[in-house]
Regions:
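An N-terminal hydrophobic leader/cap segment in hydrolases
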Residues: 1-25, 36, 270
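Short, surface-exposed "cap/lid" segments of acyl-processing enzymes
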Residues: 38-71, 78
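Catalytic nucleophile-loop/oxyanion-hole region of alpha/beta-hydrolase
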Residues: 57, 67, 83-113
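Hydrolase active-site cap/lid region
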Residues: 133-185, 195
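Short beta-strand/loop motif that positions the catalytic acidic residue
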Residues: 198-200, 205-207, 211
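Short alpha-helix in the alpha/beta-hydrolase fold that links the catalytic acid
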Residues: 201, 215-224
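Acidic catalytic loop of the alpha/beta-hydrolase fold
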Residues: 209-214, 242-243
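Catalytic histidine-centered segment of alpha/beta-hydrolase-like enzymes
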Residues: 239-253
Length: 275
């Protein structure tokens, strides 16, 4: 699916933050990506990976306000546009090569001197799914997955069920749609449930209980499948897909900050998250 390119509305200056405009290349195909580096003078850095139809200024999450709050907690931040979004190059196609864009962001942060164990990722929706895929292949310090689906197929089934569509027609048409998307648009299947067990870093799963896109069963399944008993699932009452921060900003920042303080401190050492 081709993603429309939305303009950036606002900047870190809008919420009182100093920042640097940065640019780096995606892995493999070298698509130019643009973003903001926001310093907090800490020794850890968090990468925010927006949802598929958004850019680094994601109003569904309020990434600028979230950035302000996380900087106040002492975390340096990198917000960037995935390919074909915002000011980045390339064409925006849902779920195609997003993990390589994340890889480019990690490479950039390593070039700034951050060790792997001090880098965390927060991903939303399809950005969460792609972050899970990336972390299943490469070690990072910690991972927060907000609104992550188990598989594209499960997400389609969930949407069909909500709309009263029987499962049989979905079973008939879905394989053909997936094949056409792969042939014509370079779509790559991203199914976190197939790879989450390979994620070696600590993971915090966040699920909004009134989410009409991702079912509660999905995040419970991801947490259980991950196989790490120290991974955590936070089920957020009274809010919808990717809106947990908007609904409960103080609690959200506290939980995410506490998680990363433990994860980024103990990665690679014996500690509460060691496996």
């Amino acid at each position: 699916m081709q993603i429309p390119r939305l303009p950036l509305v606002g900047s870190p200056a809008s919420v009182g933050l100093t920042f640097q405009d940065v640019a780096f290349a995606s892995r493999v195909d070298g698509v130019p990506l643009k973003g903001w580096f926001i310093p907090a003078l800490g020794d850890s850095v968090l990468v925010i990976v927006h949802g598929g139809f958004q850019n680094r200024v994601d109003p569904t999450v309020d990434t600028l306000d979230l950035a302000r709050d996380l900087v106040h907690e002492g975390y340096d931040l990198l917000l960037f546009d995935l390919r074909g979004r915002g000011e980045s190059g390339g064409k925006g196609r849902s779920l195609s090569n997003i993990d390589e864009d994340i890889g480019g962001a990690i490479d950039y942060l390593k070039s700034r001197g951050y060790p792997t164990g001090k880098i965390g990722i927060i991903g939303y929706c399809s950005g969460a799914a792609s972050a899970c895929l990336f972390a299943s292949r490469e070690r990072i310090g910690g991972l927060v997955l907000d609104g992550c689906f188990t598989s594209v197929k499960d997400m389609v089934y969930n949407q069909a069920s909500i709309r009263g569509i029987p499962r049989l027609p979905v079973d008939v048409f879905l394989p053909g749609l997936e094949l056409a998307a792969k042939v014509f648009y370079g779509y790559e299947a991203v199914n976190p449930v197939d790879v989450v067990r390979n994620v070696q870093c600590p993971v915090l799963f966040i699920h909004e209980e009134d989410d009409d896109l991702i079912s509660t069963v999905d995040d419970v399944k991801l947490t259980d499948t991950s196989g790490n008993p120290t991974n955590m699932l936070w089920e957020v009452d009274g809010t919808v897909h990717s809106k947990a921060y908007q609904a409960y900003p103080v609690e959200y920042v506290a939980k995410v900050s506490e998680f990363f303080r433990a994860a980024l401190m103990t990665t690679g050492q014996a500690g509460m998250f060691s496996q």
